[in-house]
Amino acid sequence: MSDTEYLARAEAVLASVERTVDAANDGDHDIDLERNGSVLTLTFENGSKIIINLQPPMKELWIAAKAGGFHYRFVDGEWRDTRTGTEFFSALTDYATQQAGLPITFRA
């Protein structure tokens, strides 16, 4: 994957996360969302955070959550955990639901 392709795919992920959080905040959620360059920080009512950032040199997306730190690489059309193979949006759904205390579903 070229650098241009990586950036387009990774930026699309961040945009999708932003749209999902905006929609969730229209409902029962209260999630603060801050974007600083290629870093997206979600802060939940209980003060916990999930940080998603781009890693262009490695062509990866990283998630830092209460559950730990996770690296994702684009494989066969999806962002997959480099250790477990878990799909990015599925994992983010689990981490955010745990930290928010309310269900929230992320999709590509």
Swiss-Prot record:
Please name every pair of cysteines joined by a disulfide bond in this record.
Answer: none
The protein's UniProt keywords, in alphabetical order, are: Iron, Metal-binding
Q: CDD domains under this entry? A: Frataxin
SUPFAM superfamilies for this protein: Frataxin/Nqo15-like (SSF55387)
Listed under GO biological process in this entry are: iron-sulfur cluster assembly
PROSITE patterns named among the record's database cross-references: FRATAXIN_1, FRATAXIN_2
In the record, what terms sit under GO molecular function? ferric iron binding; ferrous iron binding
Q: Which residues cross the membrane?
A: none
Q: GO CC terms on record? A: cytosol
SMART domains the record matches: Frataxin_Cyay
Pfam families according to UniProt: Frataxin_Cyay
Record-linked Gene3D superfamilies: Frataxin/CyaY (3.30.920.10)
Q: What does this chain do?
A: Involved in iron-sulfur (Fe-S) cluster assembly. May act as a regulator of Fe-S biogenesis.
Please give the family membership noted in the entry. Answer: Belongs to the frataxin family.
Q: What is this protein called?
A: Iron-sulfur cluster assembly protein CyaY
Q: Where does this protein come from, organism-wise?
A: Burkholderia ambifaria (strain MC40-6)
